[in-house]
C-alpha cells in the first residue's frame, strides 16, 4: 500500500494543551508527531550534566566486522550494528547513571498517557525497551532508513493497517536538531507500508527532518522508517531516545544490575519501567512473576512516593 503525505504539514506539531485524542490520531495517521516543550530547559541541563562524563568516555560505533557490501555479503545479524555510525555514540545505562532520568523521564505523565492509549486496550501494561543518549559528531554520515520493530521477528507477521503497534519511541532533543547537524529524518506514513512497497534505505524524497529545539521531542512508532541525518555542521547533535513496548516483549536493555537502593529511590511506575515489578496483560493476567507472587512483594521492595 502506498500512502501519500503532504510534507509541508507533517509531522504535526503539538504541545501539552493539545487534546490527547488529536495527538493519538496524528501518530496513527502519520506515524509521528513533534511535541514542543516535552521537557523544560532546566531538566535538560541537569540530564546533560549527569550524562556528560559517560558520553565523553564512551566509544564510537560501529562494532562490526568488515564485509563486501557491494557483493551483498553482510549477514543479517551484522546489519543491526551498522545503525551505529562511526562518529556516533550510543550511551546506555541511563537508569543507573542519571537521577533525572529515573525521576523526571521515567515518570513523565504525558509520555505515559500516550503509552496507555497505544497499548492499554491491546496489550495491558508496558515497560521500557531501552533508553540511550544518541550523540552525533560533526562529519557523521546519514544513517540508513530502518524500522525499529525489525528487532521483533513477529513484526513480519503484521498484515493489516489496524494491527496493534509493538513499539513507540520518544526522541528528546538535548541540543538543537537542525537539518545541517543530523536531525532525525522521518518518512511519514511509512508505518503503513506493506510488503508490496519496496523499502527505502537512502536518499528518500519522502523523508522530512524533525527540527527540534532543546526539550522538544519527536514521538514515532517503531514501524516508521527513519534514520539519523548527516551532520554537516561543526557542532555535535545530541538526543535521548526512550523506547517503550508491551510487557509481552523482552526489552533490549536489562536492569537486573541496578542496585536495590537505587531502585527503591524510584516510584512504582518507574520501577515497573525497568522490570522490577510484576505487570498485567490486557486480560489482567500477571506477567513477570516470582512464582505465584509479585516480584515487588517477594523482594520486599520499597519505593519512593508518587512523583
From Swiss-Prot:
InterPro entries: Phytyl_CoA_dOase-like
Keyword terms: Dioxygenase, Iron, Metal-binding, Oxidoreductase
Pathway the protein acts in: Secondary metabolite biosynthesis; terpenoid biosynthesis
Gene Ontology molecular function: any one: metal ion binding
Cofactor(s) in the UniProt record: Fe cation
One biological process term in Gene Ontology: terpenoid biosynthetic process
PANTHER family: MULTIFUNCTIONAL DIOXYGENASE AUSE, PHYTANOYL-COA DIOXYGENASE DOMAIN CONTAINING 1
Quaternary structure and partners: Homodimer.
Protein name: Dioxygenase cdmD
Species of origin: Talaromyces verruculosus (Penicillium verruculosum)
Gene encoding the protein: cdmD
Amino acid at each position: 500500500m502506498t500512502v501519500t503525505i503532504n510534507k509541508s504539514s507533517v509531522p504535526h506539531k503539538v504541545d501539552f494543551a493539545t487534546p490527547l485524542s488529536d495527538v493519538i490520531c496524528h501518530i496513527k495517521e502519520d506515524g509521528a508527531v513533534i511535541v514542543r516543550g516535552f521537557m523544560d530547559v532546566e531538566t535538560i541541563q541537569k540530564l546533560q550534566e549527569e550524562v556528560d562524563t559517560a558520553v565523553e568516555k564512551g566509544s564510537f560505533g560501529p562494532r562490526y566486522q568488515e564485509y563486501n557490501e557491494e557483493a551483498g555479503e553482510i549477514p543479517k545479524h551484522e546489519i543491526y550494528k551498522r545503525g551505529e555510525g562511526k562518529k556516533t555514540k550510543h550511551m546506555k545505562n541511563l537508569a543507573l547513571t542519571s537521577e533525572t532520568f529515573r525521576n523526571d523521564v521515567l515518570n513523565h505523565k504525558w509520555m505515559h498517557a500516550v503509552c496507555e492509549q497505544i497499548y492499554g486496550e491491546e496489550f495491558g501494561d508496558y515497560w521500557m525497551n531501552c533508553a540511550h543518549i544518541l550523540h552525533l559528531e560533526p562529519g557523521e554520515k546519514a544513517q540508513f532508513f530502518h524500522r525499529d520493530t525489525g528487532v521483533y521477528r513477529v513484526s513480519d507477521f503484521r498484515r493489516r493497517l489496524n494491527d496493534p503497534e509493538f513499539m513507540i519511541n520518544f526522541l528528546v532533543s538535548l541540543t538543537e536538531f537542525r537539518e545541517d547537524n543530523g536531525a532525525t529524518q522521518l518518512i511519514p506514513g511509512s508505518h503503513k507500508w506493506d510488503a508490496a512497497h519496496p523499502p527505502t534505505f537512502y536518499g528518500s524524497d519522502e523523508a522530512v527532518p524533525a527540527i527540534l529545539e532543546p526539550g522538544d521531542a519527536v514521538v514515532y512508532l517503531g514501524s516508521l522508517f527513519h534514520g539519523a541525518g548527516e551532520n554537516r555542521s561543526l557542532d555535535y547533535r545530541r538526543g535521548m531516545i526512550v523506547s517503550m513496548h508491551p510487557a509481552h516483549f523482552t526489552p533490549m536493555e536489562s536492569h537486573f544490575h541496578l542496585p536495590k537502593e537505587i531502585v527503591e529511590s524510584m516510584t512504582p511506575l518507574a520501577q515497573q519501567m525497568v522490570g522490577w515489578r510484576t505487570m498485567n496483560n490486557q486480560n489482567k493476567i500477571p506477567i513477570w512473576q516470582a512464582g505465584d507472587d509479585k516480584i515487588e512483594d517477594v523482594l520486599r521492595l520499597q519505593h519512593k512516593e508518587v512523583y
